[in-house]
A protein has these predicted regions:
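A short, acidic, amphipathic alpha-helical segment used as a generic capping/interface helix at domain edges
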Residues: 80-87
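Short S/T/G/P-rich N-terminal loop/turn motif that feeds into the first structured element of a domain
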Residues: 1-60, 67-78, 90-128
Length: 128
């Protein structure tokens, strides 16, 4: 069980996007390409990678969690070096990206050009 108001090294990202393609194509791409390639990448510090669509399926949100800032750095570097970004750009328009947790300066510099905003821990708990 976690401790109350005890910060962890965990880092979370929320990327909200609008769809540029139809919902069926987006869902198929999410399952067959994005989730599959990320899962197969076996990034040790990536804890979760979950896509969601809004009720009318015009917007998508990707939520990721990492053990620490280094996990986000590895994820981002792998993403930029892989085949997914051009495919992603054809299907989605990034509306905003939020990063939560204690993020190292080099990672902030890496992610900021993509419009990320950064949020530090203020209080709460995590039982996992």
């Amino acid at each position: 069980m976690g401790k109350l108001n005890s910060d962890t090294n965990r880092v979370y990202t929320v990327m909200h996007k609008s769809l540029k393609c139809d919902a069926d194509e987006a869902k198929q791409w999410i399952k067959d390409r994005s989730a599959k390639l990320t899962f197969e990448g076996k990034e040790e510090k990536l804890m979760s990678f979950e896509w969601y669509l809004n009720n009318d399926e015009t917007e998508a949100t990707l939520i990721e969690s990492f053990e620490d800032s280094d996990g986000l750095k590895q994820r981002f570097e792998n993403l930029m070096a892989g085949p997914i970004v051009p495919e992603w750009s054809e299907r989605f328009e990034l509306k905003y990206m939020m990063v939560f947790g204690n993020v190292k300066k080099d990672v902030i510099e890496l992610v900021t050009p993509f419009g990320a905003t950064f949020h530090t821990f203020a209080g709460g708990f995590n039982h996992r």
